[in-house]
Amino acid sequence: MGSDFKTIPIIDISPLVAKIDDPKLAASNDVMEVVRQLDEACKEAGFFYVKGHGVPDSMIKEVREITRSFFALPTEEKLKIKMTPKTGYRGYQNVGENITKGKPDMHEAIDCYRPILPGQYGDLAKALEGNNLWPETPSNFKALMEDYLSLVKDLSRKIMRGIALALGAPVDAFEGDCAGDVFWVLRIIGYPVSTDIPESERTDIGCGAHTDYGLLTLVNQDDEIQALEVQNRSGEWVYAVPLPGTFVCNIGDMLKVWSNGIYEPTLHRVTNKTPFYRVSVAYFYESNFDACIEPVECCMQRTGGIAKYDNIVYGEHLVKKVQTNFVEGRY
């Protein structure tokens, strides 16, 4: 956790996006100003908005609209793609089935992961093997989400190039053994109005306080519903106020280890206190599934010369988290 920030910084990354594959990227003053802002945001807040990202606003809105359409379907229709351990933890989960720190979260969701072939990572990924369960209704749901996935994956690569430069690493530091074959997670989430949940099952938390597991998260949230909160160093909760046309970005656990603590992920939660149903689509850009993440030399040199964290195999970290995130006995 960085500072006692009261607002979350907004970064126009258009210079970085425009020159992302230019061999002279790091020689551009405009690009290096974006890099400076990314560095400051990662240190001070662990969260930032990006604009000038190149993803069409029409696509961002359409993804939210189709998400809302799916969650408005009857429960029996949504349960056609019900998540279980047998589905590789992919599919639909009802309100209260996701658990954060032992407490049920007041949201429903479709969880998707990069498809994993049987035996692709040996026993490491056995729990998550399989393909995603896409709903048949709306009929264009799968096609739209796969187009969206392609765009946000590419955007994440661009932002991570900027973060690599901010840490004093080569621009492609996250494109080799660390994240050259990135794993990804997509959570398509709906937060009901609290009074629509039976009182006996209701809590006040849409998603409990947590940090994310991987390198970078991109959140596509409703334009007008204020619910995502980020905790500053003093323990105050600061709203990530919706800003149309932007993504809310935050860094995760793997980047903390890789940077040897130069960047630390920030606790965040969701509390939907409004009288409106809220949707959010979170894309998690992760390392290679079988990558062993460890502090890198350039970051250790800036932090005393000693590794502060043990090595972590990303896939082990993810599977352990996934298997503790759902209510036992409901499957």
Listing of model-derived features with the role each one plays in the protein:
Residues M1-Y331:
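Peripheral, non-catalytic segments flanking oxidoreductase cores
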